[in-house]
Curated annotation (Swiss-Prot):
Gene3D superfamilies: 2.30.110.50, 4.10.220.110, Baseplate protein-like domains, Gp5 N-terminal domain. The gene is vgrGB. Disruption phenotype: A double vgrGA-vgrGB deletion inhibits the ability of RhsB to inhibit cell growth. VgrGB alone restores RhsB-mediated cell growth. It comes from the Bacteria. Belongs to the VgrG protein family. Residues 449-469 are annotated as: Disordered. A Vgr protein that is probably part of a type VI secretion system (T6SS). May be required for export of proteins involved in Rhs-mediated cellular contact-dependent growth inhibition (CDI). This is Putative type VI secretion system protein VgrGB. InterPro entries: Gp5/Vgr_OB (IPR006531), Gp5_Vgr_C (IPR054030), T6SS_RhsGE_Vgr_subset (IPR017847), T6SS_Vgr_RhsGE (IPR006533), T6SS_VgrG/RHS (IPR050708), Vgr_OB-fold_dom_sf (IPR037026). It holds the Pfam family Phage_GPD.
Length: 617
């Protein structure tokens, strides 16, 4: 193929012979944190190429100069189209994307727990069959206790997670394959070539060069302040600030404040604040230009030389580049002898600047959701020291409905103070209503409970609609405790059921008023201890029935007053004994007295002794 410039473009597609396609022209768009897009216009002598041999198959574009390889780009064919057929050739068009692009076709909702961001990204890549990836990380990234991919593509989730963690990614190419590399610092980027500045329009005979270069500065955010809250340290202000060090040409008063900052600990807050500042200032100092250097790609740098402004003759990091190549010789009947050309336009920042992506949209949960309380096998109640529980969401296909299904989730209670309030721990199997703080799927909180077909209400409805009940269930048993209110007119009732013990503590007075009858039934023993006085007042009759023995112990005096008659009937013996004093039995007209020495005195109007036998000594 005749070519006066020494340039040549070739392409390999799947298992097809290398000569199947000729490259007519191509457009290659590359940028940090984006899957590249390669558009190929092709020509072939075959008018009916099998789409199955091309679509979703590997494809590699090679750029040659004087027989030496200058650049390669490999990926998979995401779109393939057949165009017009000429005298000897048929036109085709192919769109080539990296394997990472496939993750944009996979939408999911899932939970990652206690994993670092690079481990989460690795899982997603490997599930998509991508094993050629690398991490060039220079900073520590904390373990994420709970990280949710919520109704978003795997690619969108990776982009979001990478942006939150200050990561950026780019592609590197080797023979027949490409690698996605994740980095967090400009120091990890590969150093590229020196490119001299050349205003003239020349070929590659003198080497690759930059023919246009422009530099701009823009007033941008000067400072970032991020704040968050942790219930574990409620009084501590999780606030972090970061001021840019490159504010010579603008004011320092442009502060970006945001809440929540999406962190719960100081190390993460400090790092996230710096990442946010870098992202907001990504456009503060930028350059752009045009060149004929095929090797320019994101993830690398080049050093500009021979520019009239010496301030520009330094190392620049490529943020984005758009390559364009034309090879009209591929269409021999239409070429008109035009040469093969390659050019590009690029966007750069200083090589010492770490470029970071702006935070993309994070999916929000539009409203409350239903979940089921879960825990380890054999348990009925499972919580931590804060009363938090584990949940299984209906949309989580990976959870096993056990103690690993979610993070510990806080539970809203009706009243919560310092060691006082109302607490009721949702139990395993209960259905709960879950809300999300700020709509963030990473921050669930239980705000309600609901019955369902498997867990019905304590009483059948609507038959018992007038009842308000607080009924518990014995842990690993069949009993219950209950406080119930019946509000049916004429049947109003307050009912208390204690499955075992009932303890009442009153630190001051207690009053009980019963307008009708009061019945108490004690199945075992009863003990009443009164520290001071006790008064029992019965306005009518009192009946005391003791089927066993009765013992009355009085430490001091005992007084019994009967306004009418008193009758004492004993079927066997009666014993009256005064151990150290006198005994006196008296009426209005006389008495019988026995003193402590045993002397008996009888006083009265008369004395009658009747008996079969009377002995007097």
């Amino acid at each position: 193929m005749a070519n006066s410039t020494g340039l040549q473009f070739t392409v390999k597609v799947g298992a097809l012979p290398d000569t199947t396609f000729a490259v007519v022209d191509f457009e290659l768009s590359e940028a940090l944190n984006q899957p590249f897009a390669l558009s190929l216009n092709l020509a072939s002598s075959q008018p009916g190429i099998d789409f199955g041999a091309v679509l979703d198959q590997p494809c590699e574009l090679l750029v040659w100069y004087e027989g030496e390889l200058q650049r390669r780009v490999s990926g998979i064919v995401s779109r393939f189209a057949q165009g017009d057929t000429g005298f000897r050739r048929t036109r085709y068009q192919a769109e080539v994307r990296p394997a990472l692009w496939r993750l944009g076709l996979r939408t999911n909702a899932r939970i990652f727990q206690t994993q670092k961001p690079d481990a989460i990204i690795s899982t997603l890549l490997e599930e998509a069959g991508i094993t050629d990836y690398a991490f060039a990380l220079r900073h520590d990234h904390a373990v994420r206790e709970y990280c949710v991919q919520y109704r978003e593509s795997d690619l969108a989730f990776i982009n979001r997670l990478a942006a939150e963690e200050g990561l950026f990614y780019f592609h590197e190419f080797e023979a027949g394959k490409h690698r996605v590399v994740f980095a967090d610092d400009a120091g990890a980027l590969a150093k590229g070539p020196e490119l001299f500045f050349n205003l003239a329009t020349q070929g590659l005979s003198e080497g690759a060069y930059v023919r246009r270069f422009r530099y701009a500065e823009a007033v941008s955010t000067a400072e970032v302040a991020l704040k968050d809250y942790s219930f574990k340290t409620p009084a501590y202000g999780l606030l972090h600030n970061k001021m840019s060090s490159e504010l010579a040409h603008q004011r320092e008063s442009y502060q970006h404040f945001d809440y929540p900052g999406r962190f719960k600990q100081d190390p993460s807050g400090k790092a996230f604040t710096g990442y946010r500042l870098d992202a907001l200032r990504a456009g503060a100092m930028t350059g752009n230009g045009e060149s004929n250097a095929a090797e320019l790609r994101p993830g690398s740098s080049f050093t500009l030389t021979e520019h009239p402004n010496p301030a520009f003759n330094l190392a620049w990091q490529v943020v984005a580049v758009a390559h364009s190549g034309q090879q009209p010789q591929a269409l021999e009947e239409e070429s008109g002898g035009e040469p093969t050309t390659l050019s590009n336009s690029f966007e750069v920042v200083k090589a010492t600047t770490t470029w970071r992506a702006a935070l993309p949209y994070k999916p929000m949960v539009d409203g409350p959701q239903i979940a089921t309380v879960v825990g380890p096998a054999g348990e009925e109640i499972y919580c931590d020291e804060f009363g938090r529980v584990k949940l299984q969401f209906p949309w989580d296909r990976y959870g096993a409905s056990d103690d690993q299904s979610s993070c510990w989730v806080r539970v809203s209670q009706g009243w919560a103070g310092g060691q006082y309030g109302l607490i009721a721990i949702p139990r395993i199997g209960h259905e709960v209503v879950v809300s999300f703080l700020e709509g963030d799927p990473d921050q669930p909180i239980v705000t309600g409970r609901t019955f369902h077909a498997t867990n019905p209400s304590p009483y059948p409805l609507p038959a018992s609609k007038t009842r308000t009940s607080l009924r518990t269930s014995t842990h690993k048993g069949a009993g219950f405790n209950e406080l119930r209110f019946e509000d049916q007119a004429g049947q109003e009732e307050v009912f208390i059921h204690a499955q075992k013990d009932m303890n009442t503590v009153v630190l001051n007075n207690r009053s009980t008023s019963v307008n009708a009858s009061h019945t108490e039934n004690v199945g075992g023993d009863q003990t009443v201890v009164v520290q001071h006085n006790q008064t029992v007042s019965v306005k009518e009759n009192q009946v005391t029935e003791i089927q066993g023995e009765q013992t009355v112990a009085v430490t001091k005096n005992r007084h019994t007053t009967v306004d009418d008659n008193e009758s004492l009937q004993v079927k066997k013996n009666i014993a009256i004994q005064s151990q150290s004093g006198d005994v006196l039995i008296a009426t209005a007209g006389g008495f019988i007295a026995i003193d402590k020495d045993g002397n008996i005195s009888i006083t009265g109007k008369g004395l009658v002794l009747n008996g079969t036998r009377i002995d007097l000594n």
